[in-house]
Regions:
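Extracytoplasmic/peripheral linker and loop segments enriched in polar/acidic and small residues
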Residues: 342, 388, 393-407, 432-502, ...
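N-terminal lobe/hinge region of extracytoplasmic solute-binding protein
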Residues: 30-80, 111, 181
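Ligand-site clamp/hinge motif
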Residues: 209-261, 391
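Long beta-strand-rich cores associated with HINT superfamily self-processing modules
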Residues: 500-521
Length: 521
């Protein structure tokens, strides 16, 4: 039985729904992957960040246009010379264990986050002193003006600056915490956690939402359900059938070929997940041959036919070509002119393989088997590389296992890797300060570990630009350098659709699913 037939099965359509009382009190959500870790600072993948937004809160939150707004903060004051920022916490904030949220908890949380996050590292380089003046006041004393301070604290994806109790935040950043206690709108239930399969949460009755309307990660995080369940269903067809029968309320990413079926069903709805979209790309491991040779990375970039990759993950109206190192459509992003495709490009790539010293050694491509927006792109990469004459060794596994292997710096034959397909929500790679995909600072870089001093100098020029004109000039020059340095090879920009029960209202558009503002009509 194929997926469409499965969805139309009379047995499934006739399956009894949960009792109305239980359904009214419980929100059942199927994320893009199974939750296997609890620390969104140590493991900033989308699924762990989704969990993080449930359990933890942030000092500032970003709206759909990525503008920062106070969240845990009541507000802030900036000195006349722009070198001292004083952030005041809202009154009455408490952690799930009952302890009050204090400024020293936030200071410890910011420090731990900044060790692992690129934007955080840039912020701390500009910070001479970070301290708690009293229980409700956080003080940044800067070495130089840093107008993007609130943008750093409000970044909505790929390691948001979540606030934790000091006892957790004081733990080393290179080791994950195993206790999920925050001050967010949901309380994690450790006794019901099955790594990779399911997680459960209770509404935080002590949570004090802001008065403003909810928008993305900003505004009032009002929870109207008593209980939240995250359930991972590996098969997309089974998940869609469960949505149609009411066994689950929301699927983060339905399979693209099932979206038309869900749109036709009066009991289900779909909408664009995040209007800013996702940039797909191929990541190279620059530590080892042959992709430590930039000439080969350029050649592989130029044989990627983006429509092939995009058609595999999104509906025709939901993707576009994007020959850029930042998501197309965002401010100051400039596309490069793609090289001539076809036979000539393939011949150039084969020549580049020879020049890089490739002699038929196995090239390890790691690919998740349970993440449709990545899985199909990875398989297309494998096919492309084989057509170039590369001896491909394919490692497909669940997303959590691939994430663990991706972090392994060992040689490919000893548990490491050469190639990896993935994507980034536009908000998490929107500019040089937040983008983990373009940084080229060697061992400190995102897995792939590329190194290019010129790129890093230009990132610094953007961050330290004294005015808008200088920042725009720095951005233009940086994109030129990145296109030649090739830390990633873009495969296109696409917008995914999310699917939910028609009686579920208040689904927000954001880089992550925001599990508040939801009601059952």
């Amino acid at each position: 039985m194929d997926r469409r037939s499965l969805l139309m099965s009379p047995a499934l359509l006739a399956a009894p729904a949960y009792a109305q009382g239980a359904r009214a009190r419980t929100l059942r959500f199927m994320p893009q992957a199974g939750l296997s870790a609890l620390d969104p600072i140590f493991n900033p993948t989308t699924i762990v960040t989704t969990h993080g937004f449930c359990v933890f809160d942030t000092l500032y939150g970003a709206d759909r246009a990525l503008r920062p707004h106070p969240q845990m903060a009541a507000g802030h004051e900036v000195s006349a010379d722009a070198l001292t920022w004083r952030i005041t916490l809202r009154e009455g904030l408490r952690f799930h264990d009952g302890d009050p949220v204090r400024a020293r908890d936030c200071v410890a949380s910011i420090r731990r986050w900044a060790v692992r996050d690129g934007f955080g590292q840039v912020l701390m380089q500009a910070t001479a002193e970070l301290s708690a003046a009293d229980d409700r006041t956080i003080v940044f004393r800067l070495r130089r003006p840093f107008p993007a301070l609130l943008d750093a604290l409000a970044k909505p994806g790929s390691s948001p600056c979540f606030m934790m109790p000091e006892r957790l935040a004081s733990q080393p950043a290179d080791r994950p915490i195993t206790e999920a206690v925050g001050s967010g709108p949901w309380k994690f239930l450790p006794g019901e956690f099955v790594p990779g399969a399911s997680a459960a949460y209770l509404r935080n009755e002590r949570y004090i939402p802001r008065d403003e309307p909810a928008e993305a990660a900003a505004g009032g995080k009002r929870v109207h359900f008593d209980r939240l369940e995250l359930t991972w269903i590996p098969d997309g067809g089974t998940a869609a059938a469960a949505l149609r029968t009411g066994e689950i309320d929301w699927i983060e990413y339905p399979l693209p070929d099932l979206v038309p079926v869900l749109d036709r069903d009066r009991n289900t709805k779909t909408q664009i997940y995040d209007p800013n979209g996702f940039l797909g790309f191929l990541r190279f491991n620059c530590l080892y041959p042959p992709f430590n040779d930039v000439r080969l990375r350029r050649a592989i970039r130029d044989v990627i036919v983006q429509p092939d990759f995009m058609q595999a993950v999104a509906l025709p109206q939901d993707w576009q070509e994007c020959h850029a190192m930042f998501p197309c459509g965002l401010p100051n992003v400039v596309e490069s002119t793609p090289a001539t495709r076809g036979v000539a490009a393939m011949d150039r790539a084969r020549a580049a393989l020879r020049e890089a010293g490739y002699r038929g050694e196995p090239i390890v491509h790691i690919n998740p088997s349970d993440f449709p927006a990545v899985t199909q792109q990875g398989r297309l990469t494998v096919d492309l590389m084989r057509r170039l004459g590369v001896n491909m060794e394919v490692v497909e596994s669940d997303w959590a296992t691939i994430i663990a292997r991706r972090a392994n710096r060992a040689p490919p034959a000893q548990g490491g890797w050469n190639l990896h397909n993935t994507n980034g929500p536009a908000a998490t790679i929107a500019n040089p300060a937040v983008s983990w995909a373009i940084r080229m600072h060697g061992a400190a870089a995102w897995p792939g570990w590329p190194e290019d001093a010129g790129v890093e100098e230009q990132v610094a020029a953007w961050v330290q630009a004294p005015d808008v004109a200088a920042q725009e000039a720095a951005m233009k020059k940086l994109q030129e350098l990145l296109w030649e340095a090739v830390p990633i090879a873009p495969t296109g920009l696409f917008r995914l659709r999310t699917a939910f029960r028609a009686d579920l209202t208040g689904v927000l558009q954001a880089p992550n699913p925001m599990l508040w503002n939801l009601r059952r009509s």
